[in-house]
């Protein structure tokens, strides 16, 4: 069992940080994690889709995980959990990455379904994959349903509910955006199974459906605004939550369209670090970066207001 509890809230799938030569920029990894720890979020995810996991080798994955844990501990966030993305094309590699994640300081793992040979893997074999990973993983597992990152493979609510009874599978992230699926899972899974929305543009809808919160890439840029939606909803101030949700949804659409490259560009514009991706991905041109900066300005204004309170 993990030492740090997974609680409802906003979790940030952090972007990976690189120097100009594309080496991992450990100092910026730690700087960003420390910044997020002070923003009210519930935890951090590394090696997710925003974290360029597919651009990292095994040693680099472990380096980023351990640096993130070190940064959180250094600012007193010793109880804040780190979730580590460990999806891989084979069951064997996924298990090895889960073991690595635990050894490097991870508390939970987030596992995409294997999709490279999607047509050769039956539904039964797919469920067996997740069960085998959960059996072998030294830390608890969250199922990551993101058709856009898994060749269109979209786990159904039946699939996820079938896996929810496994004692080492404790939740799911639904980046499919299907709130009906989310509601069905919440209603039928046990109370200890946490269901998270995978984008902050439907945070309020996730909460209304009974979800535990969101794991949202745009929270790299506007963590307090994302947290504020949950605070207002929990306080019964739904109309105010709707207004904040609208601003956050507009910002999230920019991130959805531009991917992690857009998120990194906004971080560079507003926090002075983070733009460099790994090839073949490239940073936006100066004109594109300026346009993104302007487009994110509405949500950044809200974020700064919340930060000053």
Curated annotation (Swiss-Prot):
Which keywords accompany this UniProt record? Lyase, Schiff base, Stress response
Top enzyme class: lyase
Active-site feature positions: 173 (schiff-base intermediate with substrate)
Q: Report which reactions are catalysed by this protein.
A: (4S)-4-hydroxy-2-oxoglutarate = glyoxylate + pyruvate; (4R)-4-hydroxy-2-oxoglutarate = glyoxylate + pyruvate
Pfam families with a match to the protein in the record: DHDPS (PF00701)
Protein name in the entry? Probable 4-hydroxy-2-oxoglutarate aldolase, mitochondrial
Q: Which GO terms describe its molecular function?
A: (4S)-4-hydroxy-2-oxoglutarate aldolase activity; (R,S)-4-hydroxy-2-oxoglutarate aldolase activity; 4-hydroxy-tetrahydrodipicolinate synthase activity
Q: What induces it?
A: Down-regulated when grown with elevated levels of potassium chloride.
Enzyme Commission no: 4.1.3.16
Family the entry assigns: Belongs to the DapA family.
Name the positions where substrate binds: 49-50
- What job does this protein perform? Catalyzes the final step in the metabolic pathway of hydroxyproline. Involved in osmoadaptation.
Q: Is-annotated flag, keyword Lyase? A: yes
At which residues is there a site annotated Involved in proton transfer during cleavage? 144
Notes on how activity is controlled: Inhibited by divalent cations.
Top-rank taxon of the source lineage equals Eukaryota
């Amino acid at each position: 069992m993990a030492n740090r509890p997974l609680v409802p809230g906003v979790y940030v799938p952090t972007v990976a940080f690189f120097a100009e030569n594309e080496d991992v920029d450990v100092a910026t990894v730690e700087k960003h994690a420390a910044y997020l720890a002070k923003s009210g979020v519930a935890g951090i995810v590394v090696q997710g889709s925003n974290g360029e996991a597919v651009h990292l080798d095994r040693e680099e994955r472990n380096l980023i995980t351990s640096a993130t844990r070190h940064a959180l501990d250094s600012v007193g966030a010793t109880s804040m959990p780190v979730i580590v993305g460990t999806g891989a094309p084979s069951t064997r590699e996924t298990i090895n990455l889960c073991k690595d994640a635990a050894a490097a300081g991870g508390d939970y793992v987030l596992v995409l379904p294997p999709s490279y040979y999607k047509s050769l893997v039956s539904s039964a074999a797919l469920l067996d994959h997740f069960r085998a990973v959960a059996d072998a993983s030294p830390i608890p597992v969250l199922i990551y349903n993101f058709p856009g990152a898994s060749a269109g493979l979209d786990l159904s609510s039946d699939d996820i509910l079938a896996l929810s009874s496994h004692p080492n599978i404790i939740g799911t992230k639904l980046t499919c955006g299907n709130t009906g699926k989310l509601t069905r899972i919440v209603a039928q899974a046990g109370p200890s199974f946490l269901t998270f929305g995978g984008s902050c543009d439907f945070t309020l809808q996730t909460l209304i459906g009974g979800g535990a919160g969101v794991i949202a890439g745009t929270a790299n840029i506007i963590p307090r605004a994302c947290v504020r939606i949950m605070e207002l909803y929990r306080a019964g101030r739904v109309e105010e939550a709707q207004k904040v949700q609208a601003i956050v949804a507009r910002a999230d659409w920019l991130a959805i369209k531009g991917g992690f490259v857009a998120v990194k560009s906004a971080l560079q514009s507003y926090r002075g670090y983070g733009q460099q991706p790994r090839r073949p991905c490239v940073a936006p041109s100066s004109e594109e970066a300026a346009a993104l900066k302007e487009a994110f300005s509405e949500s950044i204004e809200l974020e700064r207001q919340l930060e000053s309170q």
